[in-house]
């Protein structure tokens, strides 16, 4: 399997390319811990200039990494939030075979491990988890399993349903039985943003992982079924955000899942005409402001 050493990171200014914050680099640090699969998990940390008023953990989506959330990070820091962003196993600067996982729930277990580090470094601080796309599914799985790990949850464009033909699913399950680590390039992941500059940066990102293994594809289908079956365990406060023109996940699936969540404090915000990555789309100021306002009302005020 490929490890973190197989990628040319030294020549790549990872934390400055995506984090456009003007805060001093002394407030940014990088570290690793060992995952439940015994591979190194890379994460980044940003601290505000002033006192910490809360913590936001970022859980990234498929193929990407925790360094692509600079637009969100630069809005959180002035509000007094410390930010921790993980790279899941098999993605970004973490170890493991690219695009592979033995059990999808391992992602949630790794976020739980990072949460332990966060709690030790920021004792007594309220914690929120922000998950996008596949990271939204991971966050829902995490919230259902470890509801006490966070004080509130933000889920953007969660991958709660996949559109696959029965024949394709059968073929994937067959390949998974014979050769689970077989890698295949995914068909187009859809257009993430209406901003051509964001699309260009995404497509040129040397850390982007365009492949998934048969095991991974079977595991995400299993996880989607499990998370939907356990929807009653989804705790609040919870904020969901969805662009109506998203062509990566299914907007109607987000609505359907949200309506089944029993939490009293739950909010669904939709953005007309927005694509998949609300935080990187044209007009991103609106969803970013909504996220900040929602967090402040529950974690600070």
Predicted regions and their residues:
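Conserved alpha/beta-hydrolase
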Residues: 73-96
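Catalytic nucleophile-loop/oxyanion-hole region of alpha/beta-hydrolase
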Residues: 63-65, 92-122
């Amino acid at each position: 399997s490929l490890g973190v050493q197989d990628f040319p990171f030294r020549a790549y200014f990872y934390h400055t390319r995506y984090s456009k914050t003007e805060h001093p680099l002394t407030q940014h640090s990088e570290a690793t811990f060992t995952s439940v699969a015994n591979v190194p998990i890379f994460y980044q940390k940003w601290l505000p200039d002033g006192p910490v008023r809360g913590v936001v953990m970022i859980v990234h989506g498929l193929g990407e990494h925790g360094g692509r959330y600079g637009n969100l990070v630069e809005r959180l820091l002035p509000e007094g939030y410390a930010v921790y962003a993980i790279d899941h196993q098999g993605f970004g600067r973490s170890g493991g075979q690219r695009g592979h996982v033995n059990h999808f729930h391992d992602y949630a277990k790794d976020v739980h491990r990072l949460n332990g580090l966060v709690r030790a470094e920021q004792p007594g601080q309220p914690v929120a988890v922000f998950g996008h796309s596949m990271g939204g599914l991971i966050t829902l799985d995490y919230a259902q399993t470890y509801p006490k790990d966070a004080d509130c949850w933000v889920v953007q464009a969660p991958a709660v349903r996949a559109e696959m033909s029965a024949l394709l699913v059968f073929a994937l399950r067959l390949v998974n039985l014979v050769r689970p680590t077989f890698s295949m390039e995914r068909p187009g992941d859809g257009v993430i943003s209406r901003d051509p500059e964001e699309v260009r940066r995404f497509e040129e990102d040397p850390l982007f992982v365009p492949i998934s293994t048969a095991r991974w594809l079977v595991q995400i289908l299993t996880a989607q079924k499990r998370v939907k079956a356990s929807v009653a365990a989804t705790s609040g406060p919870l904020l969901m955000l969805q662009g109506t023109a998203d062509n990566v996940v299914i907007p109607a699936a987000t609505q359907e899942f949200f309506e089944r969540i029993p939490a009293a404090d739950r909010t669904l915000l939709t953005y007309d005409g927005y694509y998949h990555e609300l935080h990187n789309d044209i007009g991103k100021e609106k969803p970013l402001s909504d996220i900040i306002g929602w967090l402040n009302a529950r974690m600070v005020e």
